[in-house]
Amino acid sequence: MPTYAPKAGDTTCSWYVIDATDVVLGRLAAVAATLLRGKHKPTFAPNVDGGDFVIVINADKVAISGDKVQHKMVYRHSGYPGGLRKRTIGELMQKHPDRVVEKAIVGMLPKNKLSRQIQRKLRVYAGPDHPHSAQQPVPFEIKQVAQ
């Protein structure tokens, strides 16, 4: 019997909604990246996008462990001399908490040809509401020890 190799249309995509309230950012990102890639499915193949859609709500209530809120820096550069800009994670969480969570999840995805396609399946919202109720997302519970 030959080995089964899934093709692009062979797998069905589900929608999951993850509540990020009091969930540690790294653990949330690892679980979301696993769902996005489809590694939880028996038909996983690294060369086929067989992952599920993931909606993360309450990104503004995610927990960042340790003193990273004050000390972890995020850098960006304008391309001009002296154009290095840096902010702490705490400053970014006040303005754009959805971007912080999205960057953490995207950082745990592979950097290859499928990465953009996988990133399109991720939706992050700062509040408790999302516009994807028509897709009937299934709540996904992250099991963790209380903070």
Swiss-Prot record:
Pfam family membership, one: Ribosomal_L13
PROSITE patterns: RIBOSOMAL_L13
GO MF term set: mRNA binding; structural constituent of ribosome
One Gene Ontology biological process: negative regulation of translation
One GO location term (cellular component): cytosolic large ribosomal subunit
Highest rank taxon of the organism: Bacteria
Claim: Chaperone is one of the keywords in the record: no
Keyword line: Ribonucleoprotein, Ribosomal protein
NCBIfam families: rplM_bact (TIGR01066)
Similarity field: Belongs to the universal ribosomal protein uL13 family.
Functional description taken from the UniProt entry: This protein is one of the early assembly proteins of the 50S ribosomal subunit, although it is not seen to bind rRNA by itself. It is important during the early stages of 50S assembly.
Subunit structure: Part of the 50S ribosomal subunit.
Protein name: Large ribosomal subunit protein uL13
Source species: Mycobacterium leprae (strain TN)
Gene: rplM
